[in-house]
């Protein structure tokens, strides 16, 4: 089986349907004896240029190992689902399991924010005890 990286963009008004879509698409891959190596829901993001007069879309990234029939079925599902405004399927040489740069940056920002919140909470507690 070959490895693929799949990115699809969902209409921003249909964001609440994304978890169901992810479940349906991952179910189709696993039913065809495929493996999902990475699944990232990037959320609603700004588009580089307007698509169908839209400026935002909900992004989802999948890295999978699947037979060609499963990928063909997935592409057909993308094509006939009106909520999916764009999709891209690329073949890769190896399975990618590490977090994408977008998720890494988001995690680092969250960690810095939590560290800052902990430091300010510690400082306020220390200031209260000195009085």
Swiss-Prot record:
SUPFAM superfamilies, per database record: Ribosomal protein S6
GO biological process, one term: translation
Coiled-coil ranges (or none): none
Keyword vocabulary terms for this entry: Ribonucleoprotein, Ribosomal protein, RNA-binding, rRNA-binding
Acidic residues: bias regions: 120-131
Cellular component aspect of the GO annotation: cytosolic small ribosomal subunit
Highest taxon listed in the record's lineage: Bacteria
Positions of region (Disordered): 98-131
Membrane keyword on record: no
Biased composition (Basic and acidic residues): 104-116
Sample GO molecular function, one term: structural constituent of ribosome
NCBIfam families: S6
Job description of the protein: Binds together with bS18 to 16S ribosomal RNA.
Family (UniProt): Belongs to the bacterial ribosomal protein bS6 family.
Protein name as annotated: Small ribosomal subunit protein bS6
Gene: rpsF
